[in-house]
Amino acid sequence: MPVYQLIPEIPLFPPIEEAEDDGLLAVGGDLTKERLLGAYRRGIFPWYEVGQPILWWSPDPRLVLFPDELKISRSLRKVLRKEQFEIRFDTAFQEVIKSCADVRTKQGKGTWIIPEMQQAYTELHQEGFAHSVESWLDGKLVGGLYGISMGQCFFGESMFSTMNDSSKVALVALADFSQRVGIKLIDCQMTTPHLLSLGAREIKREVFLKMLKNHLETPSIKGLWNNDPVSMKVNLLQN
């Protein structure tokens, strides 16, 4: 199948069914708020590296995590009970997204979180769509994740850790928060052994798109997410 070339400033996408076997749907376009939010509503996300045009993907199958299916290992439960990390929401979004990029670079891996992407998602954060979940230790950011929240869905983009289990604790906090505010689906996009071990599972793209349509009918939670350290501590210890 041909890969569609998108026209900048016209936020349209071809039918999802036109995607390549690897999930590649289109190239080009831009990273405006309208384009990005329109993409997520359709089950599409950008993923590309320096020197490449913007690449838009919709893989089949799709990796998702239902918040109540998160698997918490015995060792992670011990970490949660120690209350080692302080969890915060939306207090250091730019630092989280930059750390996600920097950690991958230091590990010798390529990163799609290039400066243009960081800027685009920071603007979405300022608009109340993009959020960060952060693990702090002694006043220092040591792990976290970020993504887009729309309707009853959270579209996870990336996570990082500079200490063992710090990103896992952030994911536990996200799953807990999701259940409390009515988020039904966490989109993990691409399949990885790490996410599978935490309870994520693959579903067919057509099933994902039906879920997406249903869950996006609910109004989005816009604005900064509430930070409540007392209730967060209680909920984490209940896992």
Model segments located where?
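N-acyltransferase acceptor-side catalytic subdomain
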Residues: 1-239
